[in-house]
Design a protein with these regions (language model features):
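Short, acidic, small-residue-rich periplasmic hinge/interaction motif at the N-terminus
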Residues: 33, 44-52, 86-90, 100-153, ...
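Short, acidic Ser/Thr/Gly-rich low-complexity loop/linker segments typical of extracellular
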Residues: 52-70
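Extracytoplasmic beta-strand/coil segments of soluble accessory domains associated
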Residues: 148-197, 214
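Periplasmic-side early beta-strands and strand-to-turn transitions of outer-membrane beta-barrels
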Residues: 244-245, 265-342, 372
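A beta-strand signature from Gram-negative outer-membrane beta-barrel systems
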Residues: 162-163, 207-248, 259-261, 268
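Short acidic/polar hinge/loop motifs at secondary-structure boundaries
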Residues: 74, 146-148, 193-219
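Structural motif
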Residues: 31-41
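Face-selective signature of the C-terminal outer-membrane beta-barrel domain
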Residues: 307-325, 341-480
Length: 480
């Protein structure tokens, strides 16, 4: 723990020194958003020029927005600049910037207008050339909507199975086996918060509604130091914030499941989005085959987010995820009786802010709960009845602080720390009580604390040569 404390102090010193070591240089930073919905745009290209007559020539420098829609261009001198902002599906915008020396940093809020682009047919022929293979894949909602569907509905995991390096265990299961790792070795994050079991029964479907996703990144191997705790891969999901234009919604009805989504403004600077889905297979079984002994099953899930813009430099949001699965026997009159349930509850507070030195800070406070319970009874109507009950309940309180600083035009420093408190309740009983739902003499309560710090630096030397060097240090302690 002493090493972690020393590491956190060292990180603060490094950030402070790097910020102030820029001397008389100036920084342009800010966020790029959709002017209609207010959603931040990820992967927007920004090119910097000093003369409008030289737009056809290479820029003096350039960058792209990160997963928060944020960009920073450091190491600039006093001058007049023209920033060309481009994003596929949006009109190109030119922003004039005058750096006079009065302020060391200039923070912008750039809004782009959507545009439909129509192109004539283009035929390109040529031999395939060698290229660097990256382990990171960005998947947009537009691409997800075009991928094959199951029962007319896009499923996130089934769509990811079409990507190279991603396998599945069977045609029924959607469990992701990436680069030889099992599904539980994929770090799944929703707005920076861990989801322990992001799938429904047997991985037949993910717990995410594809309509609620704003951006998705899949890292299939060699993930950087900012991610940790898993061995195989990283699935980083960002939920949509909702539109600031007007209230709107969509409803989809299916044979065995239906979904609905609603979004809109909550005020001048706030928006919301809520999406839900319900599978009613057990209801159909009762209606059309009530006497069957086939197991009954249903699930539902809810994704939601509230976004509030405090200022041009500060955004706060609350994200939530809830999913519930229930499998049970059709009748208690049979020789066996079972009831199996599991659920996810995720709630997070996310604060993004930019300080005077264009240092991007991201603070995440999360509550995470995953519970699995099962009750199995044999011959409940006889004297030889036997009932077994077990449950596992994992509750986490989690805090994560990230910092990102582009201290040179080709150098980006990322650092931060994680603090987590785990409470794991394991209960088992051979004499299940219908009233108490537990045996006070059976079970374990395990508590643990976990901490980690990381530091990494991304360098872009040329268009073909880049590096990401960093490290991560862990601390873990359990109390039985």
């Amino acid at each position: 723990m002493k090493a972690l404390s020393a590491g956190i102090i060292l990180i603060i010193v490094i950030l402070n020194n790097v910020s102030y070591s820029q001397g008389d240089s100036y920084i342009i930073s800010g966020f790029v958003k959709d002017i209609v919905t207010g959603e931040v745009l990820v992967g927007t290209n920004l090119l910097l020029y000093t003369d409008t007559l030289k737009f056809s020539e290479p820029p003096i420098t350039g960058t792209a927005t990160n997963k928060f829609g944020y960009f920073a261009i450091p190491s600039l001198s006093i001058n007049k600049y023209f920033l060309v902002v481009r994003h596929i599906g949006y009109k190109t915008k030119i922003v004039e910037i005058n750096i006079t020396g009065k302020h060391q940093s200039e923070t912008l809020s750039i809004e782009l207008q959507p545009e439909n682009i129509e192109l004539k047919e283009v035929v390109v022929e040529g031999k395939r050339t060698g290229q660097a293979i990256t382990s990171t894949i960005d998947v947009s909602p537009e691409l997800l909507a075009k991928l094959p569907t199951l029962s007319g509905e896009v499923d996130l995991f089934r769509s990811l199975e079409l990507l190279p390096g991603v396998n599945k265990s069977s045609d029924i299961s959607n469990g992701l086996y990436i680069r030889g790792g099992s599904p539980d070795q994929t770090l799944t994050l929703v707005d920076g918060t861990i989801v322990y079991n992001p799938a429904h029964l047997g991985n037949i479907a993910s717990t995410f509604n594809s309509n609620a996703i704003s951006d998705l990144k899949l890292i299939k191997g060699a993930f950087p130091a900012e991610y940790g705790g898993r061995l195989s891969s990283v699935l980083d999901i960002k939920l949509r914030s909702g539109t600031k234009e007007r209230e709107k919604g969509i409803v989809g009805l299916g044979i065995i499941n239906s979904y609905a989504e609603f979004e809109g403004p909550m005020g001048e600077n706030s928006t919301y989005m809520v999406s839900g889905r319900y599978m009613y297979y057990d209801v159909l079984q009762k209606k059309f085959n009530g006497s069957s002994n086939i197991p009954r099953y249903n699930f539902y899930d809810i994704n939601g987010k509230v976004n509030y813009i405090l200022s041009e430099k500060s955004i706060i949001s609350i994200s939530g995820l809830y999913s519930n699965d229930h499998a049970y026997s059709p009748s208690k009159e049979t020789d066996s009786d079972y009831d199996i349930q599991w659920k996810n509850v995720n709630l997070s507070l996310n604060w993004i802010q930019v300080n005077k030195k264009s240092l991007l800070l991201n603070s995440i406070l999360s509550f995470i709960n995953y519970k699995f319970s099962s009750k199995i009874g044999l011959s409940p109507n006889t004297i030889n009845s036997y009932t077994y009950f077990s449950s596992s309940n994992l509750t986490d309180l989690y805090f994560r602080q990230n910092a990102e600083l582009k201290w040179q035009q080709n150098q980006t420093l990322k650092t931060g720390f994680d603090l987590a408190y785990h409470n794991y309740d394991l209960l088992y009983s051979d004499a299940y009580d219908e009233v108490l739902e537990k045996d006070p003499f059976a079970g374990k309560d395990i508590k643990s604390t976990e901490a980690a710090i990381y530091l990494q630096n991304e360098s872009q030397f040329t268009a073909q040569l880049s590096s990401n060097i960093g490290g991560r240090l862990y601390y873990w302690k359990a109390a039985l």
